[in-house]
Each structure stands twice: as structure tokens, then as C-alpha cells.
């Protein structure tokens, strides 16, 4: 029972820290969006960088 609680706590701890997951993208002032989203203007599309698979980095507020 204790192991289940410990696992749940650690899992939630990792989920609650999304800002630390994509440091390269965030350093450019960006945020990770699904690859299908369009970054506006196109110059705000930083590419994949360190976002997860099939996601890309866009300047914050540009994902539409």
C-alpha cells in the first residue's frame, strides 16, 4: 500500500512541473504545441527543439 502511495505521489510531482520539462523551448520564450498547430507569425515557429514527439516549440501566445 505504501509503495502505491509513493508511486502516485512521485507521478503527480512530475506532472506538476511542466515548466522544467522543456527548458530549451522556454528559454526562447516559447511553449510546446502539437505539430498540427500553426505558429503565427511563422517566424515564431522554433521547430521541435526539446518538445516531446510530434510537438513543436512556438513563441508563447502564437499557437492557433
Swiss-Prot record:
Identify a single GO molecular function assigned to this protein. Answer: potassium channel regulator activity
Expressed, tissue-wise, as follows: Expressed by the venom gland.
Q: Where in the cell is it found?
A: Secreted
Keyword terms, alphabetized: Antimicrobial, Disulfide bond, Ion channel impairing toxin, Myotoxin, Neurotoxin, Potassium channel impairing toxin, Secreted, Signal, Toxin, Voltage-gated potassium channel impairing toxin
Q: Which GO terms describe its cellular component?
A: extracellular region
Q: Which cysteines are joined by disulfide bonds?
A: 25-57, 32-51, 39-58
Q: Name one GO biological process term.
A: envenomation resulting in occlusion of the pore of voltage-gated potassium channel in another organism
Q: According to the UniProt entry, where is the signal peptide?
A: 1-22
Q: Which family does it belong to?
A: Belongs to the crotamine-myotoxin family.
| Role according to the record | Cationic peptide that possesses multiple functions. It acts as a cell-penetrating peptide (CPP), and as a potent voltage-gated potassium channel (Kv) inhibitor. It exhibits antimicrobial activities, hind limb paralysis, and severe muscle necrosis by a non-enzymatic mechanism.
- The protein depicted here goes by the name Crotamine CRO3
Q: Which organism is it from?
A: Crotalus durissus terrificus
**What is the organism lineage in this UniProt record?**
Eukaryota, Metazoa, Chordata, Craniata, Vertebrata
Amino acid at each position: 500500500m505504501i509503495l502505491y502511495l509513493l508511486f502516485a505521489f512521485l507521478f503527480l510531482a512530475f506532472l506538476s512541473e511542466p515548466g522544467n520539462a522543456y527548458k530549451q523551448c522556454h528559454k526562447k520564450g516559447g511553449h510546446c504545441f502539437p505539430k498540427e498547430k500553426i505558429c503565427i507569425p511563422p517566424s515564431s515557429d522554433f521547430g521541435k527543439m526539446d518538445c516531446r514527439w510530434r510537438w513543436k516549440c512556438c513563441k508563447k501566445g502564437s499557437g492557433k
